[in-house]
Amino acid sequence: MTPADLAELLRGTAAKVLAERGLDVSVLPETLTVERPRNPEHGDYATNVAMQVAKKVGTNPRELAGWLADALTAAEGIDSADIAGPGFLNIRLAADAQGAIVAKILEAGAAFGAGHTLDGKKINLEFVSANPTGPIHLGGTRWAAVGDALGRILSTQGAAVTREYYFNDHGAQIDRFSRSLIAAAKGEPAPEDGYAGAYIADIAAQVQQQRPDVLDLPAGEQQEVFRSIGVDLMFAHIKRTLHEFGVDFDVYFHENSLFESGAVEKAVETLKDSGNLFQEDGAWWLKSTDFGDDKDRVVIKSDGNAAYIAGDIAYFQDKRSRGFDLCIYMLGADHHGYIGRLKAAAAAFGDDPDTVEVLIGQMVNLVRDGVAVKMSKRAGTVITLDDLVEAIGVDASRYAMIRSSVDSSIDIDLELWTSTGNENPVYYVQYAHARLSAIARNAADLGIAVTDPDFSLLIAEQEGDLIRTLGEYPRVVTSAANLREPHRIARYLEELAGAYHRFYGACRILPQGDEEVGPLHIARLALCDASRQVLANGLALLGVSAPEQM
């Protein structure tokens, strides 16, 4: 019996108890919640439903809890239900009902944890979207890992997810990039507002290989060649780096296409016609304060050029025209102002601002010998995704980026993430999977078949703790999807690995010496198989490998 199964049983029982006493059943929440007590001596699960409902039906919480306890104790799969405090219920499952979680996992396999909370939802998930002016830095690496994991998690809950990369190939930064390439090709210092670093010299050399005559061209043509070929080369490198990191996109959307197609101009005219733009000092402004933004925003500057928000507005309209119910933007720490402006732009078109969701990620620091390594793309000292992977590997890089909430900054300690001990979170989780895989191999070598396990034999404290932890997995995945928090999966996997390691230390799994294979061995092997499956499922959602041996 999973927590969801127990919650369903609890609601049905509560409805019956209220109805039998002529009390209002409609006061019951649609879904009841059961939690694991911090102290396992208090039971397997606890609920405060009696305290939630008692006042609404005119009774005492402890009295209602007593009615519920009597009814639950008589229910199949419940060992006991005890009242605590002002009306809490502490519930213990029967051993066979608790063990049924294991059977459910083995039956579902890779699908265990999948749900339907987002069925029919069409989501556009835009992340990374780094400018094609340099390699992906640590901030972009965080979004690559978190965004990819979030896409996987949303998909498990039934959403149709499109992973999208917004290719910023329009604007002043591309001009600065091309001028930086020209300077490098000529052996001159980078422009003051340009980009520097070895990668600039490398790309400049590649442009010259493709166009040996480029420096002989007139200045305007010269810059266009460096711009066109340089951006293509840089973006090819970005895509290759992301692919090697396990991140691929369904759509690469070019910002420039919004201007070439007239989409920006059309969006601006629509806003003018609706009265949501006003002119002041020669510029056109969006009345974004009318829609909750902290200030009005310039859309068309006084020189007639479009401000950056003009492209954002047209881009959002393009997404909605493609039928997306929800547009999630994953942006860097310096983009807090975008939340209000994007929602205001949606509202100005008569759209629901809740179709826009913005996640803001905080800074990432790489720590070497206890000192944070500074990074600056323009100064040429950028720490890149490639650098991080070279230092600690793909799995550790992804896991390190995902395991913390995106609204907190993180320090990645090279020594920690390359260590082979329990202090390294990804090693700790992967080692649990590898150890479980070794047990499965050893059982196969002994000719042991895991058939018809008797889960009622799994009564040891460590067995119960492991089973209950396994049962939490679907709820964790659902929460991670609904709250857009992939770190919940990582933290859960660490908890599960800990529960497994404690079980492994306390319970002998395989027969030793001349000992015959008994029902308890079979039940414990089934529990191991279920644990291995859930670890593999969770790691897959994070895009991290589940090694068979280490």
UniProtKB/Swiss-Prot annotation:
GO cellular component: cytoplasm
Record EC number: 6.1.1.19
MF term (GO), any: ATP binding
Matches recorded under Pfam families: Arg_tRNA_synt_N, DALR_1, tRNA-synt_1d
Protein name stated in the entry: Arginine--tRNA ligase
GO BP field: arginyl-tRNA aminoacylation
SMART domains tied to this protein: Arg_tRNA_synt_N, DALR_1
InterPro entries cross-referenced by the UniProt entry: aa-tRNA-synth_I_CS, Arg-tRNA-ligase, Arg-tRNA-synth_N, Arg-tRNA-synth_N_sf, ArgRS_core, DALR_anticod-bd, Rossmann-like_a/b/a_fold, tRNAsynth_Ia_anticodon-bd
UniProt xrefs under Gene3D superfamilies: Arginyl tRNA synthetase N-terminal domain, HUPs, Isoleucyl-tRNA Synthetase, Domain 1
SUPFAM superfamilies linked to this entry: Anticodon-binding domain of a subclass of class I aminoacyl-tRNA synthetases, Arginyl-tRNA synthetase (ArgRS), N-terminal 'additional' domain, Nucleotidylyl transferase
Cleavable signal peptide: none
